[in-house]
Amino acid sequence: MTSHPVFIDLSLDEQVQELRKYFKKLGAEISSEKSNKGVEDDLHKIIGVCEVCFKDGEPAQIDGILNSIVSIMITIPLDRGENIVLAYCEKMTKAPNQPLAKVCLQSLWRLFNNLDTASPLRYHVYYHLVQVAKQCDQVLEVFTGVDQLKSQFANCPPSSEQMQKLYRLLHDVTKDTNLELSSKVMIELLGTYTADNACVAREDAMKCIVTALADPNTFLLDPLLSLKPVRFLEGDLIHDLLSIFVSDKLPSYVQFYEDHKEFVNSQGLNHEQNMKKMRLLTFMQLAESYPEMTFDTLTKELQINEDEVEPFVIEVLKTKLVRARLDQANRKVHISSTMHRTFGAPQWEQLRDLLQAWKENLSSVREGLTNVSSAQLDLARSQKLIH
């Protein structure tokens, strides 16, 4: 979302006077005269009634009024501006409809970008900005990822508690429209806890697991097990379910669902979606061990009919998690490569051995090229001597 700098031609006193007159004309309980306590008191009074412009005003007109308020607000010194900014942010969350919510969003974004990047008030503005963005379906305009979020606060990082609160909000506003982004937010949230306070993050850990399991694009779930808050859930059903998605095959999930159907449903997880994901994860695990699989093996392991094998493999190939070739004539699937479901010590050792083999092969090629080059030079010298 882009925002233009705030610039108003009138003086502060003139702006305050005009705003007071405008809101009084709309029927607000406010004096048209300036306060003798100064511009900060004027702002408190104006912000206190500013929502009256939502009733009948046009969006463009309201945007101009809010822009005028913001232009005054950013002149207030930081040590005296917190209550004013918070009051204004709260008012912006009260827009009665989506078009006006977009106007309020633009106003908050304008305020956010005109505050000093080292101002701690930017956190509070951004928090309310996300709330308003949800009201008008504009969340991705103000939040595109964790890296972008951190860069916004690089000059004045919020406290761990503030970031936890913000991450929870971001998870809430993205979980219905972008599960992948929501899952990343929750993982980032759990990363803010330490060994000392991880035990109090039970609810956050459960939400993180459920979001990751529900996300159709998240398949590498092993990293969740290393998060401290998730470790505190060991022995709970949600942790058992996560462990199945991390390293077990489809039959383990089917048995778990039969034993704990009510629990799975209570978490908001869709059984059919879980089955689809577990089939894909099971296929990946089989592909790690078998470079070639028959259709009969797949129908048994994946609990599908034979006529479903080809469509299933095609869907797997679309994910790019596995590279394979269908052999319809011989009813087989030939595996070229697959992403590992878990990446622990064995996988690191395998990668080390592969890199070592490459190194040795490159050394052999280099040595061979050197020998060929030397032989050609010797031949060239001998031919010169002959002539």
UniProtKB/Swiss-Prot annotation:
What the protein does comes down to: Component of the eukaryotic translation initiation factor 3 (eIF-3) complex, which is involved in protein synthesis of a specialized repertoire of mRNAs and, together with other initiation factors, stimulates binding of mRNA and methionyl-tRNAi to the 40S ribosome. The eIF-3 complex specifically targets and initiates translation of a subset of mRNAs involved in cell proliferation.
The annotated subunit structure for this chain is: Component of the eukaryotic translation initiation factor 3 (eIF-3) complex. The eIF-3 complex interacts with pix.
Which UniProt key words apply to this protein? Cytoplasm, Golgi apparatus, Initiation factor, Protein biosynthesis
Q: Superkingdom, according to UniProt?
A: Eukaryota
> Where is the protein situated, by its record's location annotation?
Cytoplasm; Golgi apparatus
Which biological process, per GO, is one annotated for this protein? Answer: formation of cytoplasmic translation initiation complex
Q: Which family does it belong to?
A: Belongs to the eIF-3 subunit M family.
- Domain PCI, first and last residues per copy: 181-340
Report the InterPro entries cross-referenced here.
Answer: ARM-type_fold (IPR016024), COPS7/eIF3m (IPR045237), eIF3m (IPR027528), eIF3m_C_helix (IPR040750), PCI_dom (IPR000717), WH_DNA-bd_sf (IPR036390)
| Protein name (Swiss-Prot/TrEMBL) | Eukaryotic translation initiation factor 3 subunit M
One Pfam family name is eIF3m_C_helix
Q: Which organism is it from?
A: Drosophila mojavensis (Fruit fly)
* GO MF entry, a single one: translation initiation factor activity
Q: One GO term of the cellular component aspect?
A: eukaryotic translation initiation factor 3 complex, eIF3m
Residue ranges of the TM segments: none
Primary place of residence?
Answer: cytoplasm
Keyword Methyltransferase belongs to the record? no
PANTHER family per the UniProt record, alphabetical: COP9 SIGNALOSOME COMPLEX SUBUNIT 7/DENDRITIC CELL PROTEIN GA17, EUKARYOTIC TRANSLATION INITIATION FACTOR 3 SUBUNIT M
